[in-house]
Amino acid sequence: MSGDGSCSYSAEEGIRELLQSAKAKFRESVDVAIKLSVADSKSGESIRGAVVLPKGLGREVRVAVFAKGEHAKQASSAGADVVGDEELIEEIKKGRRLDVDWCIATPDFMPQISAIAKILGPRGLMPNPKFGTVTLELAEMVGIIKSGQVKFKSDRYGIVHVKIGDIGFTPEDLLENFNAVVAAVQGLRPTTIKGSYVRGVFVNSTMGRSFRIAGTG
């Protein structure tokens, strides 16, 4: 979140300035950083959730599904990249690494998946009812995730970092994704927070400076 915070831009202006200033010789990511007041709250709450980016991430989102029988068939038909049952869990225990962004499971698999929670958890892959990833509606959930759903969580400083695309996106597409993320985070305001919740919103590219967005904090 580096950069000169004394100058603020509208979201549209900030994104356009960001794209014009990106000079790296690779396709830089574009990220939004949202500074929240949760780090200062006595409860030490963290904010976590998921949001579908209207314009996607600009790359394939990969999904693994733990299911069997008809549910496994539904997941495969919906486009899941990896589908497995107890055998897959055993392979993960033995060191197989899942090259995916999300894991989904049917409810009956959760007791077995708990055995690999220490493997999936640190990578943010543990199925979670809060994200809709413990479900029998596998085809629907695979479709939602594939359309560009991303997870987010505030860090210990109360900052939420979310990738909203890359410098190959149009300003309009980045703006749509930006607005979706900000709205999702604002919608999770804890009732325990008094006064200001969003203290500042910034956009930046991987190697570029950050731009403070006016009217969002």
UniProtKB/Swiss-Prot annotation:
An individual GO BP term: regulation of translation
Q: Which GO terms describe its molecular function?
A: rRNA binding; structural constituent of ribosome; tRNA binding
Disulfide topology: none
- Stored Pfam families: Ribosomal_L1 (PF00687)
Q: What family, per the record?
A: Belongs to the universal ribosomal protein uL1 family.
Q: What does this protein do?
A: Binds directly to 23S rRNA. The L1 stalk is quite mobile in the ribosome, and is involved in E site tRNA release. Protein L1 is also a translational repressor protein, it controls the translation of the L11 operon by binding to its mRNA.
- The name of this protein is Large ribosomal subunit protein uL1
